[in-house]
Amino acid sequence: MSHRYSSAVVLGASMSGLLAARALSGHFERVIIVERDVLPEGEALRKGVPQAAHAHGLLVSGYRVMDAYFPRMMSELEAMGAPVGDIVGDFLWFQYGRWKLRHPSGLRGITVSRPCLEAAMRRRVKRLGNVTFLESTDGVRPIFDPADGRVTGFIARSRDRSVNQTLDAELVVDASGRGSQSPKWLEESGFGKPEEISVKVNVGYATRICERRPGDLFNSIGVIVSGTPPTGTRAAGVLAAE
């Protein structure tokens, strides 16, 4: 395969980072993922993904995008034990004071733990011949061409601060999440700080993992109970996983 561009850097081996690396792999000769954590070999929680312990799943759009970028990924997850089914016919939904009618919708979804999903995606990304992972490494700052403002590289530093690396990059994708330093880097480089808009939603989560037995969840993949607005502010869900 011929590539139009030379090098790209992706900050963060998150879900968005892995998908970005996969998308870029078809256009760049080399893609480097810079990740602060030491990535686990298998399915395990890690510090950089604190939300991983909560319930996860893929609805229709996510399911289709994942399978488009990683063909047969859903079959691979299903083989790992992740439940796949119809998001209407195989789930129980309680909304506005009543149970929704179960029927085949033709819309597929999957319920899977975040560590399992990330592990499967990392394996697929590592099979790409032109994507490499730089683990236990912090992003320091991008490098810009002073003549025209184009990004030309990125400086990365090992977590123990013993090694600095200058990476060539025609594109830098920041998938580092809420701790992103991009606004600061842009301001320090003379581009101005982007306007930041935040929406406070006041939502909290609590999760418990339980052992599932055959026949639990009323022969469904998941049970979702939503509060009725405006007074019903609590919701609950029980999702099967691998």
Where are each of the predicted segments found?
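N-terminal Rossmann-like FAD-binding beta1-loop-alpha1 element of flavoenzymes
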Residues: 3-38
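Short, well-ordered alpha-helices that flank and scaffold nucleotide-derived cofactor binding pockets
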Residues: 22, 26, 123, 188
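N-terminal FAD cofactor-binding segment of flavoenzymes
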Residues: 23, 27, 42-92
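Helix-loop-beta segment of a Rossmann-like dinucleotide-binding subdomain
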Residues: 95-114, 151-153
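Flexible phosphate/Mg2+-sensing switch loops adjacent to catalytic phosphate-binding sites
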Residues: 36-39, 43-45, 194-200
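Predominantly flavin-linked oxidoreductase catalytic cores and closely associated redox partners
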Residues: 127-242
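Phosphate-handling catalytic cores of nucleic-acid transaction enzymes
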Residues: 34, 71, 99, 107, ...
